[in-house]
Amino acid sequence: VTTAKALAWTNDCALVGVPTASCLATQAVAECGLRNEVEVIFDAGRGELYAVTASLLEDNLIWTISQGTLRTPNEWRETLPPNALVTGPGLATQHDSIQQLVDAPGTLEVPTSAAWYPRARTASAIGLAAFEKGRLTSPAQLTPSYLRASYAEDRSRP
């Protein structure tokens, strides 16, 4: 994010922010078929998952991303809707429990592990689509999303 902002300020141009969850949702539907929603999880460390829902807005590329939540793996699995399409790097830490859910008919669908991580080709396609629709972000407005303080920040507090 910092490099993109510096380049945009230096060249006096706007940016297009592409959420990682949008990238992963696009890849999941490309592999598994169109869905209106995709559940995306990331490993949040400390035994938790960061979960968001990507809802299709337009063009199979532009997604609305829900407010993320931190959940234990059990809490996350309990909130999955039936027949959910699930993706994201958090699946790598949940392999055994996800496999049990995938094996049960009508529970959820998971793309191959190659689709769990964002690809530059997908990010650029989403970025171009957003640019063509005028969905630009000023460098000052583009910020990464942090859910909590790092381990170091937690330890530095009294």
Where are these regions (language model features)?
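Flexible, glycine/charged-enriched surface loops at secondary-structure junctions
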Residues: 136-140
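Active-site glycine/GP-rich loop and adjacent strand/helix microenvironment
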Residues: 124
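Short, hydrophobic alpha-helical segments
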Residues: 127-135
